[in-house]
Amino acid sequence: MEVFPAVDILSGNCVQLVGGDRLTATVYGSPMDNARRWISEGASNLHVVNLDGAFTASTTNAEMIREVVEKTDVFVQVGGGIRSLEDARGWLNCGVARIILSTFATREPAVIRTLSKEFGSERIMAGVDARRGEIAVSGWQELAGDFIVWAQKFEELGAGSLLYTNVDVEGQQAGIDIEPVQKLLDAVDIPVIVAGGVTTSQDVTALKQLGASGCVLGSALYSGRITLKEALEAAV
């Protein structure tokens, strides 16, 4: 199972939020410094999110994200604020390995098919951010229907993988909620990466045993509740 340290960027800083609330932001320095840190500790993947883009304009922090992509040689997936085909193509053409489409894919599902045909499904990930069983969009401020129905729709449209984020436990460092993860894995055949609540090596092991293809480490990694070494060992 793959492990993705998160590099979440807000106002030019690497941060971690609780439940997607920008008022809860804890700052952890520069995005590039953190990217280099996780790579030096063994990361071969990075999960980069433009939080300003998720809330406002998609161009904010773009240069910092490009720096991470250009100055590292690891697999970088990028999400946050991709609201148009132009945005999506821009990231895919600048060297990002995979993009995550969330609100945009929910508003205009056909873009999944368009981009998968153009760039290959393996580079197109659909974001399934769920709150109380419904997909959450627009910076997790709006609910837009059953998350399983949306996941299956994204798969049918050609998404190569899904990023499932449990908003209800995200950032709380209280462990994962197994039930919705299992429900999602049973409902689709494409790879699912899980974010939200991954706090201990036991969480990583549980996700591996369930059949998740990867997990994202955020708040627990930055606060020291889990080390990257522990997570990588549990994922083997």
Curated annotation (Swiss-Prot):
CDD domains: HisA (cd04732). Pathway: Amino-acid biosynthesis; L-histidine biosynthesis; L-histidine from 5-phospho-alpha-D-ribose 1-diphosphate: step 4/9. GO terms for biological process: L-histidine biosynthetic process; L-tryptophan biosynthetic process. One of its GO terms (cellular component) is cytoplasm. It is found in: Cytoplasm. GO terms for molecular function: 1-(5-phosphoribosyl)-5-[(5-phosphoribosylamino)methylideneamino]imidazole-4-carboxamide isomerase activity. InterPro entries: Aldolase_TIM, His_biosynth, HisA_bact_arch, Isoase_HisA-like, Isoase_HisA-like_bact, RibuloseP-bd_barrel. Keywords: Amino-acid biosynthesis, Cytoplasm, Histidine biosynthesis, Isomerase. It catalyses: 1-(5-phospho-beta-D-ribosyl)-5-[(5-phospho-beta-D-ribosylamino)methylideneamino]imidazole-4-carboxamide = 5-[(5-phospho-1-deoxy-D-ribulos-1-ylimino)methylamino]-1-(5-phospho-beta-D-ribosyl)imidazole-4-carboxamide. Its EC number is 5.3.1.16. The active site is at residues 8, 129. NCBIfam families: 1-(5-phosphoribosyl)-5-[(5-phosphoribosylamino)methylideneamino]imidazole-4-carboxamide isomerase, PRK13585.1. Belongs to the HisA/HisF family. This is 1-(5-phosphoribosyl)-5-[(5-phosphoribosylamino)methylideneamino] imidazole-4-carboxamide isomerase.
